[in-house]
Structures are given as structure tokens and as C-alpha cells.
Amino acid sequence: MTSQLHKKGEAWSARFSEPMSELVKRYTSSVFFDKRLALVDIAGSLAHANMLAAQKIISADDLAAIERGMAQIKGEIERGEFEWQLDLEDVHLNIEARLTALIGDAGKRLHTGRSRNDQVATDIRLWLRGEIDRIGGLLNDLRGALIDLAEQNADTIMPGFTHLQVAQPVTFGHHLLAYVEMFTRDAERMRDCRTRVNRLPLGAAALAGTSYPIDRHAVAKTLGFDGICANSLDAVSDRDFAIEFTAASALVMTHVSRFSEELVLWMSPRVGFIDIADRFCTGSSIMPQKKNPDVPELARGKTGRVNGHLMALLTLMKGQPLAYNKDNQEDKEPLFDTVDTVADTLRIFAEMVAGITVKPDAMRAAALQGFSTATDLADYLVKRGLPFRDAHEAVAHAVKICDDRGIDLADLTLDEMKQELPNVAHLIGDDVFGYLTLEGSVASRNHPGGTAPDQVRAAVKAARAALGK
């Protein structure tokens, strides 16, 4: 027997009467994308080797050789010197082959009590756990940038919209804090998902467990897992944790996409609420005047990409019988790309938000259009004893009259207002105009969750405290 796995087939070649087709080698190889698991693969192997030695399954000398060889391999990978071989199919066999070349028979003993089925499941969980932590930090960075911008604009008034029609005045700070809430829930989902990712599959072997006297709990403790997967079949075959992460990521990107849609709209010259820093925009190859919000536009597009990965993983798993099937090799590229897309998007958005220039005059001018304080007039009448439905009808009549005349409700004199609303004229006094100002409207929503500037400042304080936890 040779001292090294020179080719993939040498891991099982005694069973077959002809070599593997070159086309099949290329078709089934995953090393050029799963090699990003190399460092966690080494970490898992070292934990496994230490357990084998502690259980007297391999010798202390074998363990020392494995640790020495893995240290060299890790250095080669980190320096970009490791030679990845297509013939060895995947990250696991590439590392095992190199280890065996370096230390001989001790390298062959590493795989005792282990299958690539539980090995790869462990690698993915180890890797994903770290990426979830990284994404959690990036979500916090974006939340922090939004909180800072909200605090700066606690008093900045803009129109709030429903159906993209002007609805009621809100503060820009309040609007931004809505996204803070969304991204806070995203961070909570990531933390919750992590609890199910953080279970150790190693020890399940191919599907049924192993006859060696292994200590799975010791390996779990070494690798920082909260516990072990309780069923060997489930441990090697399911990828629901990856699906759950991708679903949580799709929600992150959905929230990013909604925010992107508004950024594109707000930056449009027709709206002009904000400006995005030049370093996040591009120009046109033909139109010299253009400044295009490519980053938020591309984020909208990349949301579809992540949603597609979620569908790919769901479809991948839906038809598989227990236990492991080769189909599961296709779990990695959607998962890897989801992580890359979400992480890159969050990082660039945190930087972009910090560089947004707000145009409060344009926001205020827009809030003065579309009768945004009509509800405040209705509330004014209700507080004087008129049933809300009657108040609603009376104000709708006044809005129509003002719309026909091309003026706002606040432009009516007191006499004109009483004349146009004869049925409620006795309820209208000089104080009505305080209700029709933008400042009066937002200030009146002075309750937790409301848009009043004082509430926005309180919400900013609470959000910042939550971020510090």
C-alpha cells in the first residue's frame, strides 16, 4: 500500500475494476470551492485526534505527529503554498493526503472512527458558526450607523407614505429607526439560528455511529459546541441549519432591499431628500450629468440572488432519503455565496449610511404637500366631541375644496374653514392651526413608538443601549 493518497480513487480503489473517468472526476470534485473549509477542517481533525489519543485509540506519538503535520499544513495554506489537487476531490482528502505524505502511517490513523460524512457536517457547522458571528457584528455596525443618523435627524420632518402617497408627517429619525428595528430582529434571528448550528455531528461516522469507544462530548467541548447531535442519521444527512441561516439571510437582504428602494427614490432629483457620497455612486458612459446610486440598486438585485440560494437549498433537501447522499455536495456554493453577499452588503451599507447627506428643506417642502395633516384636523374635531367617522367625512370634504383651489388646509383662514365646514363650524377655534402645522402634527404623536422628536430621542437611547448588550 502506498504511503499517500495520490488520487481520489485510492481511498476506495480496491473495490473497483477500472479507474474513474476524468470527466467524472471533474464533475464530482468540490475542492476548488470547499477548500475555504480548510482551517476548520484542520481544527476538527485536531480535536478528533486528541480525543482518539485520550481514548487510547491512537498513540501519543501518533497524536504528536498529527499535530506537527497539521501545523505545517496550516502554515502552507495560510501562505498560499498548499497544492490543491483535483484528483483528490475535496478539502478533506487533500489535507489527509498531505498529512500522510508528511508523517506517514500516523496520518492514516487520523480517520479512525470518522467518515467524511460527519467530517464535512462538522466543518460546515464550525465555519458557519464563525460567519454568523461575523454577520452579527456587521448588522450591529449598520444598526449603529442608522442610529447615529436617526439621532441627527430627530427633528427633521419628512412626509410619511402609504401606497407611495403622502400620508402623515413623520420625522426622518423615526423613519430610520424603523430599519433599526428590522435589523435588530435580523440579528436576533442570527443568534437564534446559531444555537442550532452549534451542535457537533462528529462521531456519527458514515450514518450509524462507530464501534470505537469515542468521547463525542469531549470533542464538542474542545471545539466550543453546545452539545452533540443526538441522532447519527440526522447528524450526517440534514442541512436544515444551513437552510435556516439562508432564510434568515434572505430576510436581512429583504430589509436591505426595502431600504435600497427608498434610498434610490430619495436620491432621485424629483425627490431630492438625500445625497449619497460620490464614492458609493457611478456615472454614465454617455450622459455626463449622471450620478447613479449603483450600490443600493445592486443590493436590490443581490437580494434575488440570496432568495434563489434559499430555494436551491430547500429543493436540494426535499427529495433525499436518509442518510447522506451526494446531493449534499451542492449545499456549499449557495451557502458560501450567501455569506459573501450578505457580509459584503452589510459592510458597504454601514459605510454608505454614515456618508448620507440629508436635505431637510426638501423633506419639509414635500411634507407640506398632499394634505399630510388632514388626520390631525379630524383628530381635532374628535377631541371636541365629533364621532371620528363624521370628522373623517368633514375633513375629506375640506380636502377636496382645498385641492380644487390648489391650497393646503393650513392656508384657509378661520372664517373660510368655518364656511366650508358649516356642520362643524361651532367646534373650530383659533387653536386649530396649531394642529395643522408639521411640527404640531409630529409632536402630538408623543407616545412610545410614535414619531414625536422626544420619542425619537428616547428610542435612539434605547436602541443604542440594546446595541451595547
UniProtKB/Swiss-Prot annotation:
- What domain of life does the UniProt record list for this protein's source? Bacteria
What's its catalytic activity? 2-(N(omega)-L-arginino)succinate = fumarate + L-arginine
Database matches in Gene3D superfamilies: Fumarase/aspartase (C-terminal domain), Fumarase/aspartase (Central domain), Fumarase/aspartase (N-terminal domain)
Q: What is this protein called?
A: Argininosuccinate lyase
Pathway-wise, it operates in:
Amino-acid biosynthesis; L-arginine biosynthesis; L-arginine from L-ornithine and carbamoyl phosphate: step 3/3
Organism from which the protein derives: Burkholderia cenocepacia (strain ATCC BAA-245 / DSM 16553 / LMG 16656 / NCTC 13227 / J2315 / CF5610) (Burkholderia cepacia (strain J2315))
Tell me the compartments it is located in.
Cytoplasm
Q: Which SUPFAM superfamilies match?
A: L-aspartase-like
Stated EC number for the protein is 4.3.2.1
What InterPro entries does the database record attribute to this sequence? Arg_succ_lyase_C, Argininosuccinate_lyase, Fumarase/histidase_N, Fumarate_lyase_CS, Fumarate_lyase_fam, Fumarate_lyase_N, L-Aspartase-like
Q: Of which family is this protein a member?
A: Belongs to the lyase 1 family. Argininosuccinate lyase subfamily.
Principal subcellular localization: cytoplasm
Q: Which UniProt keywords apply?
A: Amino-acid biosynthesis, Arginine biosynthesis, Cytoplasm, Lyase
GO BP field: arginine biosynthetic process via ornithine; L-arginine biosynthetic process
Q: Which PANTHER family match?
A: ARGININOSUCCINATE LYASE
A Pfam family for this UniProt protein? Answer: ASL_C2
Q: Which GO terms describe its cellular component?
A: cytosol
**What Gene Ontology molecular-function terms does this entry list?**
argininosuccinate lyase activity
